[in-house]
């Protein structure tokens, strides 16, 4: 894969975060739309740029590029706003939504980007939700969630 010179000047992060609550919470249509709406709004406002994503029933994996905000500034706002919106979506009464188990890795070069993209796209395969990432609906290959890429 060839990348443009200085392609990694703006920090790129591979992050994963899990949400507690009901099973299959994030793959439900209304909840995918909540995530997509927030991520697309943050991109339109040039806060971050989503490069790749995979949504599992209780976890989201993202490769994001910092634009106007650092990960440390963007993440708490995203975390709190989406947890509140998921709770208020009315899908399941009495469920308290909280993001936890945040993992993050700074992608420093093309080799790391390729490795992280592979890991992100193969999450559904390793977790048993698909046999091939190309057949999994909720990722940046098929983009059923409608996240701007």
Model-derived regions: residue spans:
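Short catalytic/metal-binding and nucleic-acid-binding patches
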Residues: 1-149
């Amino acid at each position: 894969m060839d990348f443009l010179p200085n392609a990694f000047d703006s920090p790129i992060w591979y992050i994963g975060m899990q949400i507690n609550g009901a099973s299959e919470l994030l793959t439900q249509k209304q909840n995918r739309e909540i995530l997509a709406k927030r991520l697309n709004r943050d991109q339109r406002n040039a806060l971050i740029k989503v490069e790749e994503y995979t949504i599992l029933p209780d976890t989201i994996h993202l490769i994001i590029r910092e634009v106007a905000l650092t990960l440390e500034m963007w993440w708490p706002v995203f975390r709190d706003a989406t947890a509140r919106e998921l709770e208020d979506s009315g899908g399941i009464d009495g469920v308290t939504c909280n993001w936890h188990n945040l993992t993050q890795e700074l992608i420093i070069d093309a080799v790391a980007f390729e490795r992280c993209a592979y890991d992100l796209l193969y999450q559904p395969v390793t977790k048993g939700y698909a046999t091939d990432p190309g057949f999994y609906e909720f990722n940046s290959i098929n983009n059923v969630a409608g996240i701007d890429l």
